[in-house]
């Protein structure tokens, strides 16, 4: 028969907090993950706010989670509440405004680049370019600095947040 050390909530932010046993009975918790890209390092700032009947406690931890990141973008998928003609559109956080109840999904795009320079073909631009998170074409031979002539990989995924969405 399995035994469990803690029967508490399993919700965690991007740095793994709050840990087991950190949430006391009767407390309310807000858990957040804030991602930032500085230079070529993707960082996570995990925050937890504990609300108990007598006090509010905030805990913040940050750490790098990936290196050699050329681009990191998050877009939200908003779906209108029009049952006859539902429409879905992409928006960044500023454009969502007060329409968070219409957010049905989130698209995460991450561009990583290699650590070694590689020989790039010179006769076919299709072999030396990729489509960036914003849809623009990027030629790897025209990049400057530590990204020049390095392989770039684009990872893009859409995560559905609400089951009634049409995405």
Task: Show where each model-derived region lies.
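Short linear sequence signals and composition-biased patches located at protein termini or domain-edge surfaces
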Residues: 26-29, 50-167
